[in-house]
Regions:
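A hydrolase-biased, glycine/serine/histidine/acidic-enriched motif that marks catalytic-domain neighborhoods
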Residues: 1-280
């Protein structure tokens, strides 16, 4: 956000979860709509009549719903930018797999937990365990995979499944300390995860069409551990967008595009373009 503030093109407001208990008490089926309503109320109360909305990953769906609601209330959405975002179209009926995806946001992966498991094998294993008919990933599917190529992955997941939640998060906390030299208390990790899980479950929707333009920013570097289908995302957003869908490539991968300072500076330049065009 600092790079955007330095551009001096208008107020820059970041919105995050302050009260996790209240946030997680919102019904998952209504999560996006209610959160977007809250965001819209704050924007309107501050008197903003022309806005740019930016949503990253799952936040893109909140940005989309906010854009829809603001447009209906007469606010001009100058630009809607989604950064590597798409709806979640499958269910996680096992905590372990979702936890292992969650910890990538904290800079560690299953490779850091188990030396004999690599991320690509984990992703391939999950593809085998995935129940396409039910669109679910569950423990039954994981334990039902019999393939010697992924014996280490199955063993690692079986071990994690057998552990208590507290024991798993204690392990994650220790690995974060070892790999990143960062201390995150187990209680805080659990709170972060609870919000993340709520976001994922709340994003398992088919969004209504949006009557406006969308910019979809796509990181050019693959990230083997993130379950994002780039081509599928473009198809989904093209169906949603009743307007112009502009797909723009940006530097980095799903995480580094917003964490690496060099990439973030480049991203800020990409983000500002429609605002500069609007102001001139």
């Amino acid at each position: 956000m600092n790079h955007m503030v330095e551009q001096n093109l208008g107020p820059v407001i970041g919105i995050s979860v302050k009260d996790s208990e209240r946030y997680c008490s919102i019904d998952e089926k209504n999560l996006l709509e209610e959160v977007a309503q809250d965001y819209c109320d704050q924007i309107i109360e501050r008197g903003y009549r022309n806005v740019q909305l930016i949503g990253y990953s799952l936040g893109g769906l909140i940005a989309l719903e906010s854009a829809r609601q603001l447009s209906e209330k007469g606010v001009n959405v100058v630009d809607l930018t989604l950064i590597d975002s798409m709806p979640v179209n499958y269910h996680f009926n096992t905590e372990v797999v979702l936890e292992l995806i969650f910890i990538t946001n904290l800079g560690i992966t299953v490779e850091d937990l188990y030396n004999n498991v690599n991320n690509q094998d984990f992703k391939d294993f999950i593809a085998l365990a995935y129940n396409e008919e039910k669109r679910t990933i569950d423990e039954e599917g994981i334990l039902g995979v019999v393939d010697d190529r992924y014996a280490e992955v199955r063993s690692a997941l079986s071990e994690l499944i057998s552990m208590s939640t507290e024991a798993r998060f204690s392990s994650y906390s220790k690995v974060i300390k070892r790999v990143r030299n960062e201390e995150i208390r187990i209680e805080m990790l659990l709170d972060y995860y609870r919000i993340y899980k709520h976001n994922v479950n709340g994003s398992n929707i088919t969004p209504m069409v949006y009557f406006g333009d969308i910019r979809l920013l796509h990181p050019i570097e693959p990230m083997e551990f993130v379950f994002l289908d780039t081509e599928g995302a473009e198809i989904i957003w093209d169906d949603i967008c009743i307007g112009n869908l502009d797909v723009v490539e940006i530097s980095g991968n799903h995480l580094s595009c917003i964490q690496n300072d060099k990439y973030v500076k480049e991203l800020a330049e990409v983000i500002k373009k429609p605002i500069v065009d609007y102001l001139t």
